[in-house]
Amino acid sequence: MSDSKNLNQERQKALDNAISQIEKAFGRGAIMKLKQGAIEKIDSISTGSIALDTALGIGGFPKGRIVEIFGPESSGKTTLALHVIAESQKKGGNCAFIDAEHALDIMYARKLGVNTGDLIVSQPDTGEQALHIVEYLVCSGAIDVIVVDSVAALTPRAEIEGDMGDQHMGLQARLLSHALRKLTSIVSKANCVLIFINQIRMKIGVVYGNPETTTGGNALKFYSSVRLDIRKVSAIKDKDLIIGNQTKVKVVKNKVAPPFKQVDFDIMYNEGISKVGEIIDMGVKLNIIEKAGAYYSYNGIRLGQGKENAKSYLKTNYTTADEIEQKIRNMLASDSDVTCFNTEGSDNLHEVEEAIF
């Protein structure tokens, strides 16, 4: 018993000595025990969607992490990223938008609530330039959200300077892999959110399984703590006029909470994510709002016939909308088992592997 105790003391002394040497070499905080001041709760920035914040498990995108948003064209990827910027700015955050596609619509960003006067915007010429700008911004320690739109537009310098028909196999994937190795640690230390918007491509010759893949190789899939698959489900019409899209978002990877949760919300043209639409959908699921046929009502108050009429009512009756929203948030906060989204187990081995890594 005495020999075992002495051995444990010697092992602990050797470990303390090793930790002391590491701290001398790399500075205090380079290594520590979890009980010595590690952050237990991960800070987050809201996505602008109550349902998506809930599905992500921590109230939004995790700070100090890399996030990937991917999906087909016109599915709402940039809209979601701009909502994150708007939410960060509301709390005094500094945000940057790396517009590699050279397609940022400033007027649309303003309609989503982005303070474009304080937004840092860059339109880089090459992928290397874009990633260097990201590195400088992150290293400043003064940035809260950086959006790169998009990975597919991060064209390597060699490809731009070469001829149109030249073959450049794997250049972009190598560029991104090298950059992410550097960015991961500094993003964590700066406690900012780095969002990459990505496009979808089709793999040739796939007979079984999902033929879709994202651009830029596999590095981003591994380094991302959260990956969101965003899709347009159907058009929202006012008579014959299309006024928005019903959108589905699936959390295909989540390192900070359980993955594979799925939410639906409306993205309205010139408005973005419809807050009142979410209030109605979640209110119905939580039995806060009553739905009888096409009629919606709350506490005996008739909100309207049809969802669009109910949305119009809540837009003009702020007190009622705020009251319902507060009840939804209180119910979600008090009961972690409340489900306002679908949880789908994945039969796709590709998706399961991404969730693990």
Curated annotation (Swiss-Prot):
The identity of this protein, by name, is Protein RecA
Q: Which Pfam families match?
A: RecA (PF00154), RecA_C (PF21096)
Under CDD domains, the record lists: RecA
**GO BP of this protein:** DNA recombination; DNA repair; SOS response
SMART domains with a match to the protein in the record: AAA (SM00382)
Species assigned in the record? Ehrlichia canis (strain Jake)
Give residues annotated as binding ATP: G71, P72, E73, S74, S75, G76, K77, T78
| Keyword entries, A-Z | ATP-binding, Cytoplasm, DNA damage, DNA recombination, DNA repair, DNA-binding, Nucleotide-binding, SOS response
The record's subcellular location field reads: Cytoplasm
Q: Which GO terms describe its cellular component?
A: cytosol
The gene from which this protein is expressed is: recA
